[in-house]
A protein has these predicted regions:
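N-terminal Sec-pathway targeting helices
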Residues: 4-16
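Hydrophobic membrane-insertion alpha-helices, especially the h-region
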Residues: 13-25
Length: 193
């Protein structure tokens, strides 16, 4: 019986030691890794803030008027890049909200509305005209740009890019950009006034 008690005591000591080491390891890893920025307004608005910033994939796309627009030309200014589609009802509802949201903010933020079905230029133009969109609408005829941003299956998706051209977060699905949380989130992320 005494031998069984000793085995049990040794086993409990080993389990306790392993548990202690595991806790210490997890705490050290948490301290060494960059933490995700806390932002109550971004959380309530539904922004997925990226744990690690990464360089926003470059693009040069034609606008509806045929002018090539290059993302790198806007470096130094935070940007919202929204992927949308003409067949997407949520996208069509979000476009006028984004347009209204942009009023008075274009000096602080760059806005890009990328139509993923850009080969349907007439349909894109019709939606833009109906909603009186003045923001740059870019035509995406190749999936390369979507793949680089990881846009698959669900639109609208809006990517938040900081002044240095780094991706800092994104939203998936329609958002109410007219909400106070939207502007509060962007002010926090991009240090805007």
């Amino acid at each position: 019986m005494e031998a069984g008690m000793k085995k049990r005591s040794v086993l409990l000591s080993i389990i306790g030691g392993v548990t202690t080491l595991l806790i210490l390891f997890l705490q050290a890893g948490r301290a060494a890794s960059p933490s995700q920025p806390e932002s109550p307004s971004c959380n309530s608005f539904g922004v997925q803030i990226f744990q690690q910033k990464k360089e926003a994939p470059a693009f040069t796309l034609n606008s509806l008027v045929g002018k090539p627009i290059n993302l790198s030309d806007y470096k130094g200014k935070p940007a919202l890049v929204t992927f949308w589609a003409t067949w997407c009802e949520s996208c069509r509802e979000e476009l006028p909200i984004l347009e209204k949201f942009s009023i008075g903010k274009k000096d602080q933020l760059a806005f890009f509305l990328i139509a993923i079905d850009g080969e349907r230029k007439k349909t894109v133009q019709k939606i833009v005209d109906q909603n009186k969109i003045t923001l740059p609408v870019l035509l995406l005829c190749k999936e390369k740009c979507m793949d680089q941003y990881g846009v698959r299956g669900w639109v609208p998706q809006t990517f938040l890019i900081d002044r240095e051209g780094m991706l800092v977060g994104k939203t998936v699905g329609e958002r109410d950009w007219s909400s106070p949380e939207a502007w509060s989130c962007l002010k926090e992320l991009f240090n805007l006034r």
